[in-house]
Amino acid sequence: MFQDNIFNQWIYNMNRRNFIKRVGLLGAGYALNKNLMFANSGVASTATSFSSFPTVRKPISERNFKSPAIEKAITTFKQKVKNEELCWLFGNCFPNTLDTTVFYSEKDGRPDTYVITGDIDAMWLRDSSAQVYPYLDFMSEDKNLQRLIIGVINKQTSFILKDPYANAFYDDDTKYTRWNSDHTEMKPGIHERKYELDSLCYPIRLAYGYWKKTNDASPFDAQWKKAIETVLRVCKEQQRKHGNGPYSFRRTSEWAIDAVPMGGVGYKVNPVGLICSTFRPSDDATIFPFLVPSNFFAVASLRQASEMVQKITKDNVLADELL
């Protein structure tokens, strides 16, 4: 099986990993408890009153998307947390994605959501997933918010099918990027074509989280299944058991972080089953292509995809291949 092929050599570490995980959870719980004690202690912040903090949210009329459930969550937070600076910070940061970076529409009667990073008019598969993930818990209170997230899933599906090796895309399929001179298979509608393994994992994480919260399988149609098959194909290609695969990347640049050695495919690896990632989540080129955290992420994501494929599409062959 695919997953076993990657990580059989790491099974013996499971007990150690469980121990580290438990110790980490205990430490995190202790730190969280201390932070909550501080938050509720009424300790004076650097400002004297809540009114002295600047308002940085857009005016209501200029916000890209409005969610009553999110506004309610902000109000509840302010009622329960006494520290005014934390309340101010949460009230400005938590809704920022909805206020400033999402653009909801419908295409062919289906939700379609374009999510920019904030400073660049482009949608990263990784960033967009992480930007909306905190809102999953509020979908049951706000059906429009749920449709917005369905739109993100639909958009990501279309992007993966367009080019699974690209990391960032435009809403406009005809738009050309400043990186169009990169030495790789650039297409219109693609902002950047840096292959990052985690970029293919994040959309699965979002889809799985949505499905578990709602039990709604409507976004997971034949196109979505095709996207999952595409992700699996890329993972197999980048195990590099039969050559370097179809992807390469070079850029004319003075910055080493954008330079991929060995003709744009990276340094050679011993094909042991791990998946190569040409770039890190930071968009910087890897020196050692076996990026271990992203490989762990891939195992978790492929397991999630397998569960969804088996239960939603009933394709047991693909479900087994994903494991």
Where are these regions (language model features)?
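C-terminal segment of N-terminal export signals and the immediately downstream linker at the start
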Residues: N8-N13, K34-R63, P68-E71
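Twin-arginine (Tat) signal peptide motif
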Residues: Y12-I20
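N-terminal export signals
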Residues: I20-S41
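Well-ordered alpha-helical scaffold segments within catalytic/enzyme domains
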Residues: A69-K82, A130-K143, Y202-A217, F296-K314
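Internal amphipathic alpha-helical repeat/solenoid segments
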Residues: L98-W124, L145, P188-G189
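Acidic/His metal-coordination segments adjacent to aromatic residues that form catalytic metal sites
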Residues: D108-V115, Y176-K194, I257-F290
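Aromatic-rich carbohydrate-recognition surfaces in CAZymes
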Residues: D121-I149, I153-A256
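Catalytic cores of carbohydrate-active enzymes
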Residues: D163, N167, K236-S253, F288-F290, ...
